[in-house]
Amino acid sequence: MDRVALRGLKARGHHGVFPKEREDGQTFLVDIVLGLDTRPAAADDDLAKTVHYGIVAEEVVAVVEGEPVNLVETLAERIAQVCLKHEGVEEVEVCVHKPDAPITVPFDDVTVTIIRSRV
């Protein structure tokens, strides 16, 4: 299976368990890796035969900027489901970064990574 990756998609969301996270919001970063067969698109040099990653990026940002959820795990699941709706995408790996998570000790990043496939 081939891979198309989008790294470092950035969007502001109001996700989190604490009221301050919901009120103020924070920046989330998202990395996605789409699993699909790119051979038909490559053979014909035809965008219509592959995933349009610009559209996927816009949809992912819309999820992050959309309805708030408590857990990063839930956000990752919603992003995965949006990606799997694209024809030809058989698998997706989603990594959501929450670099400003409310943690009381020094840290670089918090991430949740999930892998989902078509059933």
UniProtKB/Swiss-Prot annotation:
What highest taxon heads this organism's lineage?
Bacteria
What's the name of the protein?
Answer: Dihydroneopterin aldolase
The record, for Pfam families, names: FolB (PF02152)
GO BP, sorted A to Z: folic acid biosynthetic process; tetrahydrofolate biosynthetic process
Which of UniProt's keywords are assigned here?
Folate biosynthesis, Lyase
Give the lineage: Bacteria, Bacillati, Actinomycetota, Actinomycetes, Kitasatosporales
| Pathways involved | Cofactor biosynthesis; tetrahydrofolate biosynthesis; 2-amino-4-hydroxy-6-hydroxymethyl-7,8-dihydropteridine diphosphate from 7,8-dihydroneopterin triphosphate: step 3/4
What does this gene product do?
Answer: Catalyzes the conversion of 7,8-dihydroneopterin to 6-hydroxymethyl-7,8-dihydropterin.
Task: Write one Gene Ontology MF term.
Answer: dihydroneopterin aldolase activity
Q: List the active-site residues.
A: 98 (proton donor/acceptor)
Q: What class of enzyme is it?
A: lyase
EC code(s) of this entry: 4.1.2.25
| Chain residues that bind substrate | 21, 53, 72-73
* Keyword Lyase applies: yes
Which family, according to UniProt?
Answer: Belongs to the DHNA family.
Give yes or no: UniProt keyword Lyase. yes
Protein species of origin: Streptomyces coelicolor (strain ATCC BAA-471 / A3(2) / M145)
The record's GO CC annotations read:
cytoplasm
Q: Which reaction does it catalyse?
A: 7,8-dihydroneopterin = 6-hydroxymethyl-7,8-dihydropterin + glycolaldehyde
